[in-house]
Amino acid sequence: MGVKAAQTGIWASQGQSIRVVGFQAQTAHRAICLLGFVVLVLLQCCSAYKLVCYYTSWSQYREGDGSCFPDAIDRFLCTHIIYSFANISNDHIDTWEWNDVTLYGMLNTLKNRNPNLKTLLSVGGWNFGSQRFSNIASNTQSRRTFIKSVPPFLRTHGFDGLDLAWLYPGQRDKQHFTTLIKEMRAEFIKEAQPGKKQLLLSAAVSAGKVTIDSSYDIAKISQHLDFISIMTYDFHGAWRGTTGHHSPLFRGQEDASPDRFSNTDYAVGYMLRLEAPASKLVMGIPTFGRSFTLASSETGVGAPISGPGIPGRFTKEAGTLAYYEICDFLRGATVHRILGQQVPYATKGNQWVGYDDQESVKSKVQYLKERQLAGAMVWALDLDDFQGSFCGQDLRFPLTNAIKDALAAT
């Protein structure tokens, strides 16, 4: 009976005493948990910087440990999470994957315990193509139909805004892209008038000078966007015929035109010169690397290649490795740092991969702070070590966490 009293706290005076103590302990525990939750929320919401993180729906199809669903995401890791991608069907925003609605729910459930988290839905992407966007944006009725379809779709599925991923507007689309953004913003303002919180509007833009010049009126689109994610990666690929880092912070000593434009520093500076407000510019940091197959015994930057690198075990795309695949590659590899560009690369056999690590992302965050930018963008959460089982640190999302910590550092 004494044991039962101790367990239930309702029979004997001794049991009642135990019940009170248990209640006090539970109350204290809950208070500590609540305090920890409040601290995490305050740390996130009160940071001066955005950490905008993309999640790709097709990552669910990767085999085994490479498969990633939205419920694997740390709800306190990013300030904004962008779901990629939505489709456009008959001039209306629409789902792309067969289970998008389920995944939308998984993602937006993260906000239940972090009300400061913002989620956006990105429309477009590489597979969508530029021509379909062009057809919609250039036709007044199609554009209007698309714009009107967006707010109810976002509200229905619990998103806080829209991200435009038109890759890329052509020269003739430049004005149409500006008009699309301006009219979308006007619709968001109008839709919010009944007392709803206004939907956010962002865009992902190229970091290449030629594309920037032909595709965007930066000064005008900046007026109507909450933030602009500049994709400061993929500066270098197998099409160059030589090795090179795809996301260098600075120009390399050996770089000549057009390579002198192919770095983060130039792209950011150029955007600022084109009147993109620093307070709206979010700088891209990749959680993937670009790999090459060497054509000779040369292994340095600028070495000849025979083509892209061997596909990764999970991503299965020649020339691309997720950070967690790179961690596997580094076992037995030789690591080098390109000091002037402040990024690493690694070689093993005839394989060469340029990537970002925790040291290089910290350098990039320090740079964006010095430029007084709005924050960092990550492509993509599912390419980081999201399980914490590949990179030997017992830490989930090591690159994204390094970015977050660097943003929070004083």
Swiss-Prot record:
Subcellular location field: Secreted, Extracellular space; Cytoplasm; Cytoplasm, Perinuclear region; Endoplasmic reticulum
Q: Which SUPFAM superfamilies match?
A: (Trans)glycosidases, Chitinase insertion domain
Q: Might you name a Gene Ontology BP term for this protein? A: positive regulation of interleukin-8 production
Q: Does the keyword Cytoplasm apply?
A: yes
The record lists the membrane-crossing segments as none
One GO term describing the cellular component: endoplasmic reticulum
Chief location of this protein within or outside the cell: secreted
Report the residue ranges that make up the GH18 domain in this protein: 49-410
What PROSITE patterns does the record tag this protein with?
Answer: GH18_2 (PS51910)
Q: Which GO terms describe its molecular function?
A: carbohydrate binding; chitin binding
Q: What residues bear carbohydrate chains?
A: N87
Chain residue ranges for the region called Important for AKT1 activation and IL8 production: 351-365
Which positions form S-S bridges?
A: C53-C78, C327-C391
Which residue positions does the secretion signal occupy?
Answer: 1-48
Q: How does it associate, per the subunit comment?
A: Monomer.
Described by its record, this protein's role is as follows:
Carbohydrate-binding lectin with a preference for chitin. Has no chitinase activity. May play a role in tissue remodeling and in the capacity of cells to respond to and cope with changes in their environment. Plays a role in T-helper cell type 2 (Th2) inflammatory response and IL-13-induced inflammation, regulating allergen sensitization, inflammatory cell apoptosis, dendritic cell accumulation and M2 macrophage differentiation. Facilitates invasion of pathogenic enteric bacteria into colonic mucosa and lymphoid organs.
Tell me the protein family, please. Belongs to the glycosyl hydrolase 18 family.
Name it.
Chitinase-3-like protein 1
Q: Which organism is it from?
A: Pongo abelii (Sumatran orangutan)
Quick one: which gene encodes this? CHI3L1
